[in-house]
């Protein structure tokens, strides 16, 4: 017998759409299931001003399929030259919903990010005053710190001092990958929340490294050991209001992934909801799927939940997803969850 679950239509609180041909290929995959998404600003060149954000939003809206019901929620890329007045005006106009902090060199297209945090304190102080959230890629870039330890080091040496200096700043610690990150978000005082990705719930570093290197599982923050994956699953499926979905769906062409020095990023927009239903079902927590995908995020960003609904069905045969998508510039590989998915989104 078919099992079904109806939830409010979900949102994605961390999404990379890229631009140009890639955006035209991947945007329909997000718009099919998600009503809204926080759009990452790490283009080349990055989205650093209100004018940049407006132009990017216009390009996204122009690329939407006919009849699509999708709202891009724009962000600005924080640099050491960011103007607090420009940020405040963009927020007041409803153009942006967050500012993104990339430590310089931490991930894809982060070269323009922040090298010295104190240099952006005037912007962060203004954000604290007006209630504008700061989304953080929480990893240090010190080459002496092991890549598997960079999230914990960031929390201990950067985030905790930052929040002590600016206790009123709204912070979203994005794509949490460790039990340390989960424990910090649960236990910290003040206005803190965290996003968790689809792929970090589904895989751990064994999936990436055992039996051969699988470049399409390479992402930043890098997948960790299974014990951290289990901590992420407990947090996501708990219904805790500080955790919500941010897929960090980050497409790269196969040629940029399947190479001697491949790019970091996982494209998961198409099958995310099937993956999440699988995780929550497996962990006996389907009752909390709606909170994670559809309720906690809007509450965090001061928005109402979507009025529309989505129905997921569990069938007795796996759902087949395309392994690859074609773009004008070459093929793109969809995230492989490494297990059959019996849940699907009902049309």
Swiss-Prot record:
**Disulfide pairings:** none
Give the stretches traversing the membrane: none
Coiled-coil region(s) at which residues?
none
Q: Which UniProt keywords apply?
A: Hydrolase, Metal-binding, Pyrimidine biosynthesis, Zinc
The protein's Enzyme Commission number: 3.5.2.3
MF terms in GO: dihydroorotase activity; zinc ion binding
Which positions in this protein are listed as binding Zn(2+) 1?
A: 14, 16, 100, 248
One Pfam family this sequence matches: Amidohydro_1
The residues the record assigns to binding Zn(2+) 2 are: 100, 137, 175
Q: What positions constitute the catalytic site?
A: 248
Where N6-carboxylysine occurs, residue numbers?
A: 100
Entry GO CC: cytosol
Q: What class of enzyme is it?
A: hydrolase
Which residues are noted in the entry as substrate-binding? 16-18, 42, 137, 220, 252, 264
Catalyses: (S)-dihydroorotate + H2O = N-carbamoyl-L-aspartate + H(+)
Q: In which pathway does it act?
A: Pyrimidine metabolism; UMP biosynthesis via de novo pathway; (S)-dihydroorotate from bicarbonate: step 3/3
Which cofactors does this protein require?
A: Zn(2+)
The cofactor note from the UniProt entry for this protein is: Binds 2 Zn(2+) ions per subunit.
Return the similarity comment.
Belongs to the metallo-dependent hydrolases superfamily. DHOase family. Class II DHOase subfamily.
* Quaternary data: Homodimer.
Described purpose of this protein according to its UniProt entry: Catalyzes the reversible cyclization of carbamoyl aspartate to dihydroorotate.
HAMAP family hit by this protein: PyrC_classII
The protein, known as: Dihydroorotase
| Gene designation per UniProt | pyrC
């Amino acid at each position: 017998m078919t099992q079904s679950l109806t939830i409010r239509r979900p949102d994605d609180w961390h999404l990379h759409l890229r631009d140009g041909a890639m955006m035209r290929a991947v945007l329909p995959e997000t718009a099919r299931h998600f009503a809204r998404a926080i759009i990452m600003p790490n283009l080349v060149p990055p989205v650093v001003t209100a004018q940049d954000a407006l132009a990017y939003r216009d390009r996204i809206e122009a690329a939407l399929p006919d009849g699509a019901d999708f709202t891009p929620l724009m962000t600005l890329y924080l640099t050491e030259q960011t103007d607090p007045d420009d940020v405040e005006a963009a927020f007041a106009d409803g153009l942006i919903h967050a500012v993104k902090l990339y430590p310089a060199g931490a991930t894809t297209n982060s070269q323009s990010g922040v090298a010295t945090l104190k240099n952006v304190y005037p912007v962060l102080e203004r954000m604290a005053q007006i209630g504008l959230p700061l989304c953080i890629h929480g990893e240090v870039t010190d080459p002496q710190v092991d890549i598997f330890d960079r999230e914990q080091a960031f929390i201990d040496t950067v985030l905790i001092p930052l929040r002590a200096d600016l206790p009123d700043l709204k912070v979203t610690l994005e794509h949490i990958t460790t039990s340390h990150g989960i424990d910090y978000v649960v236990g910290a005082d003040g206005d803190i929340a965290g996003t968790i990705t689809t792929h970090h719930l589904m895989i751990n570093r064994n999936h990436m490294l055992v039996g051969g290197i699988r470049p399409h599982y390479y992402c930043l923050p890098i997948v960790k050991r299974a014990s951290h994956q289990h901590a992420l699953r407990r947090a996501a499926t708990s219904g805790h209001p500080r955790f919500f979905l941010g897929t960090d769906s980050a497409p790269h062409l196969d040629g940029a992934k399947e190479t001697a020095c491949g790019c970091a990023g996982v494209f998961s927009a198409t099958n995310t909801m099937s993956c999440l239903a699988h995780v929550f079902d497996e962990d006996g927590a389907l009752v909390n799927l709606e909170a994670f995908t559809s309720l906690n995020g809007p509450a965090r960003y001061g928005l109402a939940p979507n009025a529309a609904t989505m129905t997921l069905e569990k069938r007795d045969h796996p759902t087949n997803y395309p392994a690859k998508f074609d773009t004008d510039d070459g093929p793109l590989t969809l995230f492989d969850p490494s297990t059959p998915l019996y849940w699907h989104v009902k049309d």
